[in-house]
């Protein structure tokens, strides 16, 4: 999948480190503490997208300026795989 040059998608280990947890919580505020999966999009050292999964649900969000560039799809693929 082609992403913008500055963007990388990663599956960090769980539980998320405090800084990643705060950034993911900003993007997906309804996500619970206990996650079963997470994929984050990073650009310029900051989290610009998150796809979080937990027992009984999931949430995804990408910062407005980065939407429509394939990041949503890359996050969904990463959290599933």
Where would I find each of the regions flagged by the language model?
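Conserved acetyl-CoA-binding loop-helix of GNAT-fold acetyltransferases
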Residues: 68-81
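Detector for intrinsically disordered, low-structure N-terminal pre-sequences
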Residues: 6-8, 46, 78
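Conserved beta-hairpin
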Residues: 34-51
